[in-house]
């Protein structure tokens, strides 16, 4: 009986780890739909550290679980002109170090895993208010209302071991569609965004188990104040809802109802060199990680 309970609990831990991996879409990231000049490249290096409490459903005999995640990300993006629209195409490759510590049936337990995460390809199109501009035209551009859409694909190439609970990759495709709006009034910029996250099934959870997940809804809003060229301060919130999972066809009551708030500041180091500092914090988390995340990003424009 104890062995069966242990197996069931281990599968529940897998589902919680899935929630932690999907939580990256819930980060507060300002200025996702700002216009960019065509023909310009952006190379970014990002380090992020997340720490905090991990929340499981009541069927899991785990207590006082704390998690630490160190993430290193390299991304390359290029501004494009497609049909007169401003388009940003980007590719990001993460490397993560995940560690969990807590009590299992009252006894100390821990786990750690390092490796490459799932690469993400993102295509963002500004549908209104941000035409494709050359770098020379972009310098005199005054944004007002911008409507944009983006589509991201998470490719299951990250490190995944079907015999392990903790994994850096998800072993499934993830698609994220978003529609966003930004409006500029003087030095102030207001943003809102809605999206849906879809994921394919994973048929290799602990070798023989099948994981499915309902779509997850995403809402985000924020406000930014521009001090001058390249210098701004922003804050906002994000919300994830839904995403119930099925394990071997049995639906679980583990939908997300997670709120996060955050702030970011960006400033230039020199011409073509930009730094950004971000901090996000979990306000409420039903399933997954109630984490605080600190991120430092450097971007080279050329």
Region locations from a protein language model:
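Surface-exposed strand-loop-strand hairpins of Gram-negative outer-membrane beta-barrel proteins
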Residues: 50-71, 109, 162-169
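Outer-membrane pore/translocation modules
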Residues: 97-212, 254
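Residues on the lipid-exposed face of transmembrane beta-strands in outer-membrane beta-barrel proteins
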Residues: 45-47, 74-78, 121-127, 151, ...
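Outer-membrane beta-barrel biogenesis signature
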Residues: 22-44, 129-145
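Transmembrane beta-barrel strands of outer-membrane/channel proteins
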Residues: 43-49, 89-97, 149-155, 192-198, ...
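Repeated loop/turn-to-beta-strand initiation elements of outer-membrane beta-barrel proteins
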Residues: 53-54, 84-87, 131, 187-190, ...
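Outer membrane beta-barrel transmembrane domains
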Residues: 209-302
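Residues that define the transmembrane beta-barrel architecture of outer-membrane proteins
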Residues: 39, 66-74, 114-121, 145, ...
